[in-house]
Amino acid sequence: SVEERLTISNMAVEVGAKAGIMVPDEKALAWIRNRTNKSFEPVYPDQNASYFNKMTIDCSILVPQVALPHRVDTVLPIDSIGEIPIREAFLGTCTNGRSVDIEVAARILKGKKVHPDVRFIVAPASREILLESIRKGWLEMIINAGGVLVTPGCGPCVGTHQGVPGDGWNVISTAN
């Protein structure tokens, strides 16, 4: 999806790249057209462009990963870390507070309760996603399960507010 491409581009920079650029295709252009009535001109690479490094990754062979403190690029396969009790679960921010993320969480939590020792915080990536999540009832499911909603956008990933964990807390988070 376009949203997944945006996440990959954002995370490329988080792990040290200067940029994470994807050539726009019709799907990306339609996504932009649906969000603005202003004209725009897509940017494409020159026909004879040279690259320092060009990577192709077969995502179908990737296994779920978990980043360990305190860097997003210190990762291990999730199956290799064993069971670790958590104190906070954070879903959201600009990178991973997408509609699909919130929908999946809502469906998992429907009819269930968040553990009383766990603080579950949801930060939609944007106002648009917040409104969609309200309309579709996803946030109601999450709140009924014991989750907490915070304003869309940045927060604990920059260490400023809305979900900054307590000392010694283990946190599972989609934030970058």
Task: Place the predicted regions along the sequence by residue.
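Fe-S-dependent hydro-lyases/dehydratases of central metabolism
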Residues: 1-176
